[in-house]
Amino acid sequence: MINIYGKGGHANVINSILSQTHSKQINFWNDESYEKEVGDFDHYNNNIKGDWIIAIGNNKNRKKVAELLGNDCYITVTHNSAIIDANINPGEGSQILHGSVIQVGTKIGKHCIINTAASVDHDCILGDFSFIGPNATLCGGVEIGEGTFIGAGAVVLPYIKIGKNCMIGAGSVVTKNLPDGITAYGNP
């Protein structure tokens, strides 16, 4: 059995991928209170068998659920159209969507989302709970900190380091290193 924690569009995408690649029963779970106050995650952890995937696009909420669920049976979800170097081992709970390309030497942390048609070039490092938006491009040697969001169509130039919990706007071009907690957008 596979348990999807989440609802909405991203959970539907994950369900679609799993339906094509797994013959196991798929169950949906969510708790409306995770955005405000956490529900009874011990019930989920102790009483529900099978593998888990957290299908929540918001990095902070995904991390909160992972910490509270505390389950160590997370699966990685990869669409069969993604092109991934044979030596890449994404962290548990990570999700690699349709048409993404991930090159040699890249390290992907736990519970990352690499969205539709994103390109992650050689030797990149993606921190836990990071999000790479649709059609975003990370050039070679880029480092993305934990919990950082890279918006749709953004480009991060080679060997740039972006700190933890940053927000890079859609269509932006990142040309210099950014410290933790920065919101950046635009194209120089």
Residue ranges and their predicted role:
Residues 9-12, 60-61, 173:
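Short alpha-helical
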Residues 1, 53, 116, 125-128, ...:
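Glycine-rich hexapeptide-repeat left-handed beta-helix
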Residues 1-18:
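Glycine-rich adenosine-cofactor-binding loop
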Residues 70-123:
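Hydrophobic, well-structured mid-protein blocks that either form specific transmembrane helices
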Residues 33-85:
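Phosphate-bearing ligand-interacting subdomains
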Residues 21-36:
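NAD(P)-binding Rossmann-fold cofactor-contacting core
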Residues 55-57, 98, 187:
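Glycine-rich, N-terminal phosphate-binding loop of Rossmann-like dinucleotide-binding domains
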